[in-house]
Amino acid sequence: LIKRFHIAKHKKQKEVVIWGSGKQMREFLHVDDLASAAIFIQNLDKKSFENNTKPRLSHINVGCGSEITIKDLAIMIKETVGYNGKILFDTSKPDGAPRKLMNSNRLNKMGWHHNIELKDGLKNAYDWFIKDMEHTIE
């Protein structure tokens, strides 16, 4: 969506169309937080790791624990990019799963928590896009 809003801004498009109703809920985690969680888990002592991955608990979910509607995400991206047009939702297209939220309680109880809030992560991603990817847009 960052790229789409950026293109719409620079081409002075009046609207950005997003599939679905915008009501579907999603959780987003910055890649740096995912890397941090992986290192945290890797550095656990063996006993602590085994105590938290007993049989039938072999997977450790990594997430931030909060969710946002696609509509609110789109508004946040629109503001981050500085796009002034409208956001339209094409309800003739599918929403996908109504909700996707990880249960990261086990990892949080081990002592790991995410550090980068969504708004900050979007700004970081857009700054990176401007610096390293904008030249790839036709």
Residue spans of the language-model regions?
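C-terminal substrate-binding subdomain of Rossmann-fold SDR/epimerase-dehydratase oxidoreductases
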Residues: 1, 7-138
